[in-house]
């Protein structure tokens, strides 16, 4: 009995680390600021057939409607209530999206903003996405309801009431992040209101949560909230399934708060990943791709089974958050595709792909003065994601997840899932290759000269279609063909001026 109980508790503890994606689906995509109606369509027409596991959606709860600057993306991170009512859509549209996505095997992960309410400087009134009244000055949020008792004003010891020193773990948790009213998560009432919101989402059918600003909450307070959560909806998930949890903790080293403080609750965002990979692929600070041989824990990252990884996210692609100038984004398309390709081929971590919108970037003294700009809109109403004849998106939606090179690497990861990291090659510089057991092989040329070499792929003999330069369609290849001989070797030739200086082949791209 003791052994059974031990196994049961371990099983229970492990649940929040597994993604709840359908078998054979290994990545999620952040459809940043998309409307629920567009996400529902995208699940059906694209994400499900292309092998995506799920979608991270923008915060679905009511927020402040900010008009100066006009409707910025960050207003979504200033809650007013837990009503499902935002510029992405209302509760009916949200339910419809979750149902339709789940029905085609694509999961929904909610960005949960639970550390705080809106900023202390916002004026009282009903300028909110559902018209709820709120008064930050008197700490009054009747639509929840929260009042003065439910905030950390009395607990914070800094003069301003805001976080002033990141080397003081207590003020990082108990004071206001950039003036955002800090909820008293130590109170059972507050925990219960948050759990009620999250349980409402679980009952609708979501598969898990990104926990925003986790660094600014005590790990024990997060745990107390998670302990109140329901199991997932058994219409779509096995009986007893727990929500997937990944916590946003920016830990680049050098601060008292560590990612590992949060492992007991679930996975954690590994911000070192994109910052370092960007530096390597840009070849800054003497970094080379050959150094990626021991990528992952060997670079001082958290354990693979605790990491949620990404090349860029909605914050750092516009200079917010962490990582600085090394972060690669869709603006750096050629290098970005290589970085995302490397991430999706490498076994480390659980992978999230970014899907962005364009904004009028304008740098003054090294800072993008338009880093606040919200999604494509007509006078504040978010524009539809239109699909062009060539399958790209219109209306200033970037849709990196639809770029052939990225979409095909999402599938590559599915095909090689569970296979070991094998057959590493490097030239001591920026030409590298590696395989995933006998299921996949990828080659990169990030040097300033041509790559031409015969390598051991570990794959069965045959003709393979390179899924970077083309697609396998009806048994034919629209891109480069790679011939693997009986001994598993193949010749690769990649010009340094190629549109995409990398090649990837896998078991399902065999002709």
Curated annotation (Swiss-Prot):
Binds 1 Ca(2+) ion per subunit. It comes from Homo sapiens. The record marks 315 as: Transition state stabilizer. Ca(2+) binds at residues 115, 173, 182, 216. The modification Pyrrolidone carboxylic acid is found at residue 16. The modification Deamidated asparagine is found at residues 365, 427, 474. The active site is at residues 212, 248. Belongs to the glycosyl hydrolase 13 family. Calcium-binding enzyme that initiates starch digestion in the oral cavity. Catalyzes the hydrolysis of internal (1->4)-alpha-D-glucosidic bonds, yielding a mixture of maltose, isomaltose, small amounts of glucose as well as small linear and branched oligosaccharides called dextrins. Disulfide bonds join 43-101, 85-130, 156-175, 393-399, 465-477. It comes from the Eukaryota. Glycans are attached at residues 427, 476. Keywords: Calcium, Carbohydrate metabolism, Chloride, Disulfide bond, Glycoprotein, Glycosidase, Hydrolase, Metal-binding, Pyrrolidone carboxylic acid, Secreted, Signal. It catalyses: Endohydrolysis of (1->4)-alpha-D-glucosidic linkages in polysaccharides containing three or more (1->4)-alpha-linked D-glucose units. One of its GO terms (cellular component) is extracellular space. This is Alpha-amylase 1A. CDD domains: AmyAc_bac_euk_AmyA.
């Amino acid at each position: 009995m003791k052994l059974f109980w031990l196994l049961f508790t371990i099983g229970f503890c492990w649940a929040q680390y597994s993604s709840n994606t359908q078998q054979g689906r290994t990545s999620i995509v952040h459809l940043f600021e998309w409307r629920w109606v567009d996400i529902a369509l995208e699940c059906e027409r694209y994400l499900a057939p292309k092998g995506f596991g799920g979608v991270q959606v923008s915060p679905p709860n009511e927020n402040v409607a900010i008009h100066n600057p006009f409707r910025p993306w960050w207003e979504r991170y200033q809650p007013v209530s837990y009503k499902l009512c935002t510029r992405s859509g209302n509760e009916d549209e949200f339910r419809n999206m979750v149902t339709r996505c789940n029905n085609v095997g694509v999961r929904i992960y909610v960005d949960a903003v639970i550390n705080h309410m809106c900023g202390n400087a916002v004026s009282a009134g009903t300028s909110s996405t559902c018209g709820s009244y709120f008064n930050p000055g008197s700490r009054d949020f009747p639509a929840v309801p929260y009042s003065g008792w439910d905030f950390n004003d009395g607990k914070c010891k800094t003069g301003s009431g805001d976080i002033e020193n990141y080397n003081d773990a207590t003020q990082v948790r108990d004071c206001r992040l950039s003036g955002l009213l800090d909820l008293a998560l130590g109170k059972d009432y507050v925990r219960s209101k948050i759990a009620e919101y999250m349980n409402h989402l679980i009952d609708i059918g979501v598969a898990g949560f990104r926990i925003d600003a986790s660094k600014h909450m005590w790990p024990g307070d997060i745990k107390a909230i998670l302990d109140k959560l329901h199991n997932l909806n058994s219409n779509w998930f096995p009986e007893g399934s727990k929500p997937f949890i990944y916590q946003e903790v920016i830990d680049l080293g050098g601060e008292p708060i560590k990612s590992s403080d949060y492992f007991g609750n679930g996975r954690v965002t590994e911000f070192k990943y994109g910052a370092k990979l960007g530096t390597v692929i840009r070849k800054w600070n003497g970094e080379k791709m050959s150094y990626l041989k021991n990528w992952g824990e060997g670079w001082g990252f958290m354990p693979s089974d605790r990491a949620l990884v990404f090349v860029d996210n909605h914050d750092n692609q516009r200079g917010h958050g962490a990582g600085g100038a090394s972060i690669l984004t869709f603006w750096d398309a050629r290098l970005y595709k290589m970085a995302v390709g490397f991430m999706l081929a490498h076994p480390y971590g659980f992978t999230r792909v970014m899907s962005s919108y364009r904004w009028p970037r304008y740098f003054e003294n090294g800072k993008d003065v338009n880093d606040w700009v919200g999604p494509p809109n007509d006078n504040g109403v978010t524009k539809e994601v239109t699909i062009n004849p060539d399958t790209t998106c219109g209306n200033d939606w970037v849709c990196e997840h639809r770029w052939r090179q990225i979409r095909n690497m999402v599938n590559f990861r599915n095909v090689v899932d569970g296979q070991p990291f094998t057959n590493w090659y490097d030239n001591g510089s920026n030409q590298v290759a590696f395989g995933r057991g006998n299921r996949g092989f990828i080659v990169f040329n990030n040097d300033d000269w041509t790559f031409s070499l015969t390598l051991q792929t570990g794959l069965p003999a045959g003709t393979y279609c390179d899924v970077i330069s083309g697609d396998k369609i009806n048994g034919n290849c629209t891109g480069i063909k790679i011939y693997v001989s009986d001994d598993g070797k193949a010749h690769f030739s990649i010009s340094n001026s190629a549109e995409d200086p990398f090649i990837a082949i896998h078991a399902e791209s065999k002709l």
